[in-house]
């Protein structure tokens, strides 16, 4: 514990020094870019590229909804896709622009996504500017609710998946990771996207069922899930997944 605290203090001192010298942002961007190529990260990075290559190929269009600082975008770009990168949070948006702003295969949109066009209040974690949510339920009832204080807010413009599709065309793949706001995002979609993934947490599993039922209302769809950042489906066939959802 003492060693961990010392390392955290050292990390903070280094960040403060780099920030004072206006070096933190370029150094951090370099770290993000080379991180996948660290020896201990190469195999997981390759596995994820192989996994997503099952769904998309070079030239396909993808949506990264709730892009954070572009970790999914990075995998998709390595496959050769084009990515519409959507992120409302200022700090994350700044990071995405620094990393991908000059990439012609990336379109960066500084908006949130929801059921309808409007302006909403985005809650931002006091301890980490990179964690934010539009969901009151996620702030109050998720397993993360005791870990963060939500004293900061940001007014954000909200668009819909249908609007994005109308402007950029139907994507082959769409990833949605919006900290408990996934169902609201899906309610702004009236078309079936060939491949779509959304995040859910075990303590808010009923919300995941709502997402699945809504997608089923759009047409014939199949479901499975992966655990965490793994690169294999949890269930080998659809029927096991259906039985699990009925529990």
Predicted regions mapped to residue ranges:
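Phosphate/nucleotide-binding beta-alpha loop and adjacent structural elements of enzyme active sites
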Residues: 1-247
């Amino acid at each position: 514990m003492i060693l961990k605290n010392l390392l955290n203090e050292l990390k903070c001192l280094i960040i403060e020094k780099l920030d004072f010298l206006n070096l933190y942002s370029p150094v951090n961007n370099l770290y993000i870019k080379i991180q996948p190529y660290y020896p201990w990260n190469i195999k997981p990075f390759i596995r994820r590229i192989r996994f997503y290559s099952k769904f998309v190929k070079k030239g396909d269009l993808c949506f990264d909804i709730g892009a954070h600082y572009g970790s999914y975008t990075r995998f998709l770009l390595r496959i050769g896709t084009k990515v519409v990168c959507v992120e409302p949070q200022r700090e994350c948006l700044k990071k995405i622009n620094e990393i991908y702003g000059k990439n012609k295969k990336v379109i960066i949109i500084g908006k949130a996504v929801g059921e309808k066009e409007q302006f909403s209040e985005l809650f931002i974690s006091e301890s980490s500017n990179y964690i934010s949510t539009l969901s009151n339920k996620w702030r109050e009832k998720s397993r993360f609710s005791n870990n963060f204080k939500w004293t900061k807010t940001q007014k954000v413009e909200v668009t819909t998946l249908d609007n994005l599709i109308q402007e950029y065309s139907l994507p082959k793949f769409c990833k949605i990771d919006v900290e408990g706001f996934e169902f609201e995002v899906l309610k702004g979609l009236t078309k079936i996207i060939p491949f779509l993934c959304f995040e859910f947490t075990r303590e808010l599993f009923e919300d995941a069922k709502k997402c699945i039922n809504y997608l089923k209302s759009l047409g014939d769809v199949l479901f499975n899930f992966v655990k965490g950042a793994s690169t294999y489906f949890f269930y080998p066939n659809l029927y096991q997944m259906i039985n699990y959802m009925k529990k």
